[in-house]
């Protein structure tokens, strides 16, 4: 596994400090909310992405093992859902936020080109829109990583997020407003909702002096501008 090779190579080549980026997917599906770092391994994972979560947990544990056995300074950061420029907008395998941006853009763009008017037909989205999710812009993540490199040296993981969440319905409405899509949404309840809620407790990282600076709507707007210039 590449994580093992990378962590081992960093240690053997004298890297002074290593940051391992995990994911909020490591936490149990029914973890207490907001999720604190000690919720790790306290329950069953979400079955739709448990293989991914287990791989991240393995990397986290390996960092801890190298710290204990060799004194290697490796820290583990657990970011929430990330988005921003250079995201993956492929509808076959993208995450929810960039997928919504693309669907809203293409829905508006296709009909505007055909009839020169607003799009009045809904686009399909998974689930019922009730799950709550937290989103962090990549620029805020970069600042958090830098802060932790300077100020964090503990063996335990540290959450990185905004500490605020929205329902997927609210997210879709915000994206539609930014994009200018007016057709509404068809929520396909035959598709899974996934974890009902996932928001991180970020008290630990905020105690280091870091705070997210980019609001969700502001971040969506800048991401949409990047998408139009580079992907659309």
Each model region followed by its residue ranges:
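Short acidic-hydrophobic sequence patches enriched in Asp/Glu that either
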Residues: 92-96, 167
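Catalytic helix-loop patch of NAD(P)-dependent Rossmann-fold dehydrogenases
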Residues: 4, 12, 16-17, 25-83, ...
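Alpha-helical segments that scaffold the active site and NAD(P)H-binding pocket
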Residues: 8-9, 64-69, 101-105, 150
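Active-site loops and adjacent core secondary-structure elements that bind or stabilize anionic groups
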Residues: 1
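Conserved active-site region of classical short-chain dehydrogenase/reductase
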Residues: 4-7, 61, 139-142, 146
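C-terminal substrate-binding subdomain of Rossmann-fold SDR/epimerase-dehydratase oxidoreductases
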Residues: 100, 106-232
């Amino acid at each position: 596994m590449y994580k093992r090779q990378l962590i081992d190579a960093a240690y053997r080549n004298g890297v002074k400090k290593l940051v391992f980026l995990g994911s909020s997917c490591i936490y149990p599906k029914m973890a207490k909310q907001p999720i604190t770092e000690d919720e790790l391994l306290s329950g069953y994972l979400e079955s739709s992405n448990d293989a991914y979560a287990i791989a991240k947990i393995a990397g986290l544990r390996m960092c801890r093992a190298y710290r204990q056995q060799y004194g290697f300074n490796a820290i583990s950061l657990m970011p929430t859902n990330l988005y921003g420029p250079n995201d993956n907008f492929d509808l076959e395998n993208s995450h929810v936020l960039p997928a919504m941006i693309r669907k809203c853009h293409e829905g508006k763009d296709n009909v505007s080109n055909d009839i020169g008017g607003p799009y009045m037909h809904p686009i399909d989205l998974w689930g019922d829109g009730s799950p709550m999710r937290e989103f962090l812009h990549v620029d805020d993540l970069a600042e958090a990583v830098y802060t932790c490199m300077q100020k964090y040296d503990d063996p335990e993981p540290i959450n990185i997020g905004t500490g605020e969440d929205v329902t997927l319905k609210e997210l879709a409405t915000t994206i539609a407003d930014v994009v200018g899509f007016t057709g509404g949404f068809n929520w396909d309840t035959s598709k899974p909702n996934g974890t009902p809620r996932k928001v991180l407790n970020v008290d630990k990282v905020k105690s280091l002096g870091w705070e997210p600076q980019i609001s969700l709507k502001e971040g969506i707007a800048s991401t949409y501008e990047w998408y139009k210039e580079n992907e659309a």
